[in-house]
Amino acid sequence: MKGKKWFLALAAVLCLMGTAWAGEREIVYNLGIEPRTIDPVLNSAVDGSTVLYNISEGLVRIGLDDAPEPGCAESWEVSEDGMSWTFHLREGLRWSDGKPMTAEDFRYGVQRMFTPENACPFAYVGYFIKNGEECFKGTAKLEELGVTAVDERTLRLDLKHPSPLMLDYLSYHIFFPARADVVEQDPRGWSASGSFPCNGPFMITEWQHNSELTVVKNPHYWDADKVKLDKVRMVMINDVNTALAAF
């Protein structure tokens, strides 16, 4: 699993088979198949990741130089022993429905990864977080997890051990924020319709299952000025010959 910056994924589709221009600021991309899930902590497939990295963003993102750079977090500090990281969210962050984003959304998102009932397939990636492995295996309470929303714009991660790749890991979709008020309505199926608030450069406007998923530019994205596309249509054509004929 690799963290990918949203526009790297979009740039890549321009040189892949199954991609075509459908308008001046719109592209059509062949997703191939219907994503099994686009829940950040349940997804383990490329098709789901393609959608997720276009509609969501974590504390950090991966830049064009393939290195971590500030995403929703504008800055961070590390303790001298490397065991505590404090992230400061950008001012004015909002979800696609206009609701303010807070550090609690990130804390909740990370907690979902280690909730045993969710059986997150990539939870082991986050075992560097204090009590992460223990929470996932049910030997520690989620309240003991080393993730704290200090205030609305400050998130602290306490670690089990220093991790030189931690910033890279934080760009992965398993660390994306989540809205408790949305998820708790249907913990296992909340993302199935696509009608949920997003925090990335795009947001879902239509999902015709097994046919097409459409995303449009998210006006509330903090870096919206750099998003040059208005719409991306992700069609689902599994057969290569059919895909070639369609484009």
Task: Place the predicted regions along the sequence by residue.
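Bacterial N-terminal signal peptides that target proteins for export
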Residues: 1-8
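Surface-exposed binding/hinge segments that line
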Residues: 88, 107, 121-181
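Bacterial N-terminal signal peptides
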Residues: 9-17
